[in-house]
Amino acid sequence: MKFSKFFAPTLKEAPKDAILPSHVFLIRAGFIEQLGSGLYNFLPLGEMVIEKIKAVIKDEMDKTGALQVNFSFVTPSEFWQESGRYNVYGKELLRIKDRKENGFVLSPTNEESSVKMIANKITSYKQLPIHIYQINTKFRDEARPRFGLLRGREFIMKDGYSFHANMEDLKREFDVMEKTYTNIFSRLGLNFRAVEADSGAIGGSGSKEFMVLAQNGEDDILVCESCKYAANIEAAVRVKREAPCAAPETEKMQKFHTPNMKTIDDVANFFKVDKFFTVKAVIKKAVFVDKSEIVLFFVRGDDELQETKALNACGALEFEDASEDEIKKAGLIAGFCGPAGLPDDINFYIDKELKNERNLIVGANEKDYHIVGFAVTNFKDERFVDLSQVRAGDCCPKCGAKLDIKKGIEVGHIFQLGQKYSKAMNAIFLDENGKAVPFFMGCYGIGVSRLLAVMIEAGHDEKGCIWNTQTAPFKLEIIISNSKDEDASNFAIQLYEKCKNAGISTLLDDRKERFGVKMNDFELIGFPFAVLVGKGLKDGNVELIERKGLNKKIVSSGEIFETLKGILC
């Protein structure tokens, strides 16, 4: 391709709301353009990268025997009502109606569509397993679209759905997909981790996220360098913490007057104890499909409540801040809540690490009073759940080594859905005994357009993008420093034809632009290599530039083609 015939409009400045490097450079370098909030066009350079990503995904998926399909982007509302997700999904699900008042949704995901495609067509265990996937446009009505392609409203996604006769076969496919996704992201040249994760709105039991490690990552990941355990902070677990010092001695449980001491710091300082021996009460207003209510969560005083764990514990859609009036109406006294003596209608949960702990300080459920010497016993087992947020320095649940926190960006997620959707939608098959059984399902997603941004978050410098050879729109750019130099132009064209015939994707910058403009565009767009054909040609030399590090090397004009073949073929 010749640059003079190509469409790659570059900009000197990025939009003011572009903060992350990927957002800034993808717009400035002419890969994408913004249409509206969370909406983007892909220009030729961007589309070329997207197609390369799709090709890698398709190649690896097809190797597993998965079959490519294409679901309608617009899905009848009754599919989502049948699965039970129509109201649960919330405002991110864009609901529309046609001229006949028929309801539809713009699909953010396609579990329902996949069930409809398979149900009543696959009827026997003999036809299982089957795995279908698509690479298609999705829409999620984000409340605050930001960070360019990392948090847009319209996006491209690969989503796959597998159907099985039993849980064992689903787990087998889950492991196959973990290996397949590992192959995909490795081929794309990414530094990533597969981590334990929360299933979120998709549901199901086991799930893993694939996180690319990046300084500007939106997620915190707990990692163990000793055994390679890794988990999203929403799902991370730890070895039960040990007391940092001896517990305060108390002969019996007593109530103490603690005027205006509403915080853990106040209480710990008053009793001169480590916060480890106090219990923190966190009051939340939990929102459900048909109601909202006050829920209490208890964790150690020096721990923080992990909100996703808390949502999963009580089954709420989301939390809202409870007003003072709502707290009082519920019969609670903020700052002095404890697990014993709560109003009968208050739902509460206790972090499992507190089970059977003794000599703790808790709220007395009475204004200006705390209880010392409290024992967390005599509570039903269902009250105890994992609620604490794991942090750096906590001990790995697999090997006991210290955990560290890294930043990551999610690029893929795989789920064991089990029978959640097949039961809800009455999608059944006949098993070996002739019994009607709901399918066991798996779900497997990759953020295709998000990967475009992730690659730049992981590969850029202050000048622009740095593409690797696996995903670059062109592996090589040949730059004619002066388009009026006939010898340089002729040599560059000959080299361009040789590279093209050798299968090296090459862009010839033959534009009648100043040399500085051409170099700035090369550094901004970020092709892996460039050959500069300029004044040195008179001495039989050209300059080979590697975009990563902008390392330059003088190469004989007679040897440059073989050098390029050695690097890029």
Swiss-Prot record:
Principal EC category: ligase
Pfam entry (one): tRNA-synt_2b
PROSITE patterns tied to this protein: AA_TRNA_LIGASE_II
A GO biological-process term: prolyl-tRNA aminoacylation
One of the record's GO molecular function terms: ATP binding
Protein function: Catalyzes the attachment of proline to tRNA(Pro) in a two-step reaction: proline is first activated by ATP to form Pro-AMP and then transferred to the acceptor end of tRNA(Pro). As ProRS can inadvertently accommodate and process non-cognate amino acids such as alanine and cysteine, to avoid such errors it has two additional distinct editing activities against alanine. One activity is designated as 'pretransfer' editing and involves the tRNA(Pro)-independent hydrolysis of activated Ala-AMP.
Subunit structure: Homodimer.
Family of the protein in this entry: Belongs to the class-II aminoacyl-tRNA synthetase family. ProS type 1 subfamily.
Official protein name in the record: Proline--tRNA ligase
Taxonomic source organism: Campylobacter hominis (strain ATCC BAA-381 / DSM 21671 / CCUG 45161 / LMG 19568 / NCTC 13146 / CH001A)
